């Protein structure tokens, strides 16, 4: 992507490097234990039996169990993106819907400093997918986090598979915007970043399996 200085981002850490790959190739600890006490009545227990109530039906989680729900970079009340019904179709339209969804899982990874969600849909042949996930995981391991770098995803369109050689049933072209972003260390110091970008484009090729779509190829494009 000419004029974006994307390759210069490779010198940065984590988000800077990860987003460079995307556009040029294209704390919490354990909860404190409950130490509260419960008072015990001195009177003898009643022999009457309390009426039993029906157990509440457990809420079904609409995304995988390892998808994070918290993060430094989340907006108030923000929820993970949901797999769209349109992506269930084995059609180009279904592939387009899935491509948009996958990019939103990448956005969620930047928001939470956790790539678990996107990794559910990234195939082993997608080198950029693996690189992005590794960069985000490295940031988390260093107790760093991201500020900004949120993606706005525009509607995907069909694009030819060739010259991609990875296994693919369909390919989609996704345009997206990125807000200004930086990486923040454990002390709150901002030590790397870049300005906002608009109109970046990425090619996503996908293959349909019984369990759904997987991304097999991902690269930035002009």
Question: Positions of the model-derived regions?
Answer:
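Sec-dependent bacterial lipoprotein signal peptides
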Residues: 1-24
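Exposed beta-sheet edge and beta->alpha loop/turn motif
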Residues: 5-8, 27-44, 49, 161-222
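Secretory-pathway extracellular proteins and peptide precursors enriched for disulfide-bonded cysteines
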Residues: 16-18, 120-121, 160-163
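Juxtamembrane and targeting peptides
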Residues: 22, 26-94
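Core segments of small alpha/beta cavity-forming domains
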Residues: 73-147
């Amino acid at each position: 992507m000419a004029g974006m200085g994307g390759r210069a981002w490779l010198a940065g850490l984590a988000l800077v490097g990860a987003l460079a790959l995307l556009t040029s190739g294209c704390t919490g600890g354990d909860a404190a234990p409950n130490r509260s006490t419960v008072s015990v009545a001195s009177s003898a227990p009643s022999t009457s039996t309390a009426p039993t109530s029906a157990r509440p039906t457990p809420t079904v989680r609409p995304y995988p169990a390892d998808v994070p729900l918290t993060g430094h970079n989340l907006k108030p009340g923000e929820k993970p993106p949901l797999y769209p019904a349109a992506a269930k179709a084995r059609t180009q339209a279904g592939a387009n819907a899935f491509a948009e969804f996958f990019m939103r899982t990448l956005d969620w990874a930047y928001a939470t400093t956790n790539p678990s969600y996107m990794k559910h849909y990234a195939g082993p042949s997608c080198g950029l997918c693996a690189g992005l996930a590794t960069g985000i995981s490295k940031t988390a391991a260093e107790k760093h986090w991201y500020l900004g770098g949120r993606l706005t995803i525009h509607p995907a369109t069909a694009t030819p598979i060739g010259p991609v050689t990875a296994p693919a049933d369909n390919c989609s072209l996704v345009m997206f915007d990125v807000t200004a972003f930086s990486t923040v260390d454990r002390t709150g110091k901002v030590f790397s970043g870049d300005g906002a970008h608009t109109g970046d484009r990425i090619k996503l090729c996908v293959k349909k399996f019984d369990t759904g779509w997987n991304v097999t190829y991902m690269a930035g494009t002009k």
